[in-house]
Amino acid sequence: MATLFIADLHLCVEEPAITAGFLRFLAGEARKADALYILGDLFEAWIGDDDPNPLHRKMAAAIKAVSDSGVPCYFIHGNRDFLLGKRFARESGMTLLPEEKVLELYGRRVLIMHGDTLCTDDAGYQAFRAKVHKPWLQTLFLALPLFVRKRIAARMRANSKEANSSKSLAIMDVNQNAVVSAMEKHQVQWLIHGHTHRPAVHELIANQQPAFRVVLGAWHTEGSMVKVTADDVELIHFPF
C-alpha cells in the first residue's frame, strides 16, 4: 500500500482538462491508497464555502467518494485556497490539517506543508500572507456579499501576477535556512511540500544527518504526486 500526496492543481472552470485528470485520479490511483493528502492550492481561488460554483460541488462529491471508499483524505491550505473552511471539508469528507504536520509513515517521520512559508526571501509576499491570515480580516471578508468578494479576489490575483512578473526566480523559491530550520524544529529527515511548482528531490543536511526535501509539481499538462511506501519515496509525473 501507499500514501499519496498532491498539490497545486489550481482547479478552475477555465482548465477543464486538469479537472478531468483529477477526477480520473480520484476514481483510480487514489482509491488504492492508504491515505490521500492534498497540500494546498487545490483550487485557483477560494472566496468562501458559500460560493455556489458548480465545480466546487462536483469536486466535493468526487473527493467524498474517495473518503467513503475507505481512503482518508486530508487537506492543508495553500496560498490560493486558505479560506477553504469546515463546510467544504465536511461536504468532501476531508480532514483539515494545520499548516505544518508531522506524519509517521512506514518508519519515517515526514513533515508536510504547502510550502509558501519557506519562501522567506520574498518579504513582500510574507507581509501580505501575514495580513490575510489575520482571523478578524478573514471574518470581515467572508461577511461581504459574494459579488464583492469576487471582485476583490480578481483584483488580488491581478496584483499578484503583476508583482511576481518582476520578481526573480530565486526570491520566489524556498530559503534553504528556512527549510533546515523547519526540519530541525520538527526533528524530521523528510519534508514534502508544493507551492513553488519546481518538482524535484533535494538532498541536504538537517539534524546533522542526510535529509530529503521532495517538491510536488503543479498540474499543468500532466499530473504530479509523491508516492510513499515502506520501501521508497517517489516523485511521479503521469498523463491526464
From Swiss-Prot:
Cofactor: Mn(2+)
Main subcellular location: membrane
Positions of Mn(2+) 2 binding: 41, 79, 114, 195
Superkingdom of this protein's organism: Bacteria
Keyword set includes Membrane: yes
Binding site for substrate: 79-80, 122, 160, 164, 167, 195
Inactivation phenotype: An insertion mutation defective in lpxH is not viable and accumulates UDP-2,3-diacylglucosamine.
GO annotation (BP), single: lipid A biosynthetic process
Binding of Mn(2+) 1, residues: 8, 10, 41, 197
Annotated localization: Cell inner membrane; Cytoplasm
Pathway field: Glycolipid biosynthesis; lipid IV(A) biosynthesis; lipid IV(A) from (3R)-3-hydroxytetradecanoyl-[acyl-carrier-protein] and UDP-N-acetyl-alpha-D-glucosamine: step 4/6
InterPro entries cross-referenced by the UniProt entry: Calcineurin-like_PHP_ApaH (IPR004843), LpxH-like (IPR043461), Metallo-depent_PP-like (IPR029052), UDP-diacylglucosamine_Hdrlase (IPR010138)
Catalytic reactions on record: UDP-2-N,3-O-bis[(3R)-3-hydroxytetradecanoyl]-alpha-D-glucosamine + H2O = 2-N,3-O-bis[(3R)-3-hydroxytetradecanoyl]-alpha-D-glucosaminyl 1-phosphate + UMP + 2 H(+)
Co-factor: note: Binds 2 Mn(2+) ions per subunit in a binuclear metal center.
Activity's dependence on pH: Optimum pH is 8.0.
Enzyme category, top tier: hydrolase
Coiled-coil parts of chain: none
GO CC, one annotated term: extrinsic component of plasma membrane
Keyword line: Cell inner membrane, Cell membrane, Cytoplasm, Hydrolase, Lipid A biosynthesis, Lipid biosynthesis, Lipid metabolism, Manganese, Membrane, Metal-binding
Pfam families in alphabetical order: Metallophos
EC number: 3.6.1.54
Stated family: Belongs to the LpxH family.
Role according to the record: Hydrolyzes the pyrophosphate bond of UDP-2,3-diacylglucosamine to yield 2,3-diacylglucosamine 1-phosphate (lipid X) and UMP by catalyzing the attack of water at the alpha-P atom. Involved in the biosynthesis of lipid A, a phosphorylated glycolipid that anchors the lipopolysaccharide to the outer membrane of the cell. Is essential for E.coli growth. Does not cleave the unacylated UDP-GlcNAc, the mono-acylated UDP-3-O-(R)-3-hydroxymyristoyl-GlcNAc, and CDP-diacylglycerol.
Protein name per Swiss-Prot or TrEMBL: UDP-2,3-diacylglucosamine hydrolase
The encoding gene: lpxH
